[in-house]
Amino acid sequence: RGALILKVNYRGSAGYGAKFRLLNYRNLGVGDAWDVLSGVDHLVKQGWVDPGRVGCMGWSQGGYISAFLTTSSKAFKAISVGAGISNWATYYYNTDITPFTVNYLGDDPADDPAIYAKTSPMTHIKKAATPTLIQHGEFDRRVPIPYAYELRQGLEDRGVPVEMVVYKGFGHGLSKPKAVRGAME
């Protein structure tokens, strides 16, 4: 009965020093996914959650991890992707924070396309099966909205149930209580 929320402190999170951040170096998405899945597995083994009723949601970096999980795992009943990156190779050229990408992936996509493919949800789209809700701010410049459309189209092309909500007038984050509540519901 009820609900349990697991807030994963996935590897690479800020504020824990260089060693912790480097756990995600050239393993972005992959390592994060392991952290999320191991947390869920622990809750299932403890008998605290029904494995058939587990969902996943995240925003920004968490949205990227959710996008990665929707294309690489069948562990969830449903997934919500909020302002998530779907393709690192094109993101490198289309964001205002290219250094962030280099800090985690180590090179640009022209010099190391393999690492960009490994860590991009769109690379794994053929494995997608989880019903997915995509949420994105209309004027997001950090993760421009075409990444949401790309993921949606990839899921639709594979027959995966997908819905998309575009928050009119918003950028990368939701700042009004009504919009925040809507994203959580």
Q: Regions from the language model: what does each represent?
A:
Residues R1, K7-E185:
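Active-site-proximal cap/loop segments of hydrolase catalytic domains
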